[in-house]
Swiss-Prot record:
One GO biological process term: translation
Bias kind Polar residues: ranges: 7-19
Keywords for this protein: Ribonucleoprotein, Ribosomal protein
Lineage top rank: taxon: Bacteria
HAMAP family assigned to the protein according to its UniProt record, in alphabetical order: Ribosomal_bL27
UniProt lineage: Bacteria, Bacillati, Actinomycetota, Actinomycetes, Frankiales
Keyword Ribosomal protein included in the entry's annotation: yes
Stated name of the protein: Large ribosomal subunit protein bL27
GO cellular component: cytosolic large ribosomal subunit
Naturally occurring in which organism (per UniProt): Parafrankia sp. (strain EAN1pec)
A Pfam match: Ribosomal_L27
Length: 95
């Protein structure tokens, strides 16, 4: 019988912290400038109108407005529809 524990027991016992990736603000939600919309590795979502991209591919709002998810040329795109744009669209549509 062995008088020692398994030799690898002290080499185990570590785990990496979660990266907390994913969508932080969903479609229709109101955001302020600078708020993070999506944390990602690689460009799963691409920046659209009024959305910036950080060096770690994080998408963030460049202006206040509502978040809008869509597709452009087969890519998933995140846009910000500003309050000014919404007002202009409502004024242009006859009631």
């Amino acid at each position: 019988m062995a008088h020692k524990k398994g030799a690898s027991s002290s080499r185990n016992g570590r785990d990496s912290n979660a990266q907390r990736l994913g969508v932080k603000r969903f479609g229709g939600q109101l955001v302020k400038a600078g708020e993070i919309i999506v944390r990602q590795r690689g460009t799963h979502f691409h920046p659209g109108d009024l959305v910036g991209r950080g060096k770690d591919d994080t998408l963030f709002a460049l202006a206040p407005g509502h978040v809008e998810f869509g597709r452009k040329r087969g890519r998933r795109v995140v846009n910000i529809v500003s309050a000014d744009t919404e007002r202009a669209e409502k004024a242009a549509v006859p009631a």
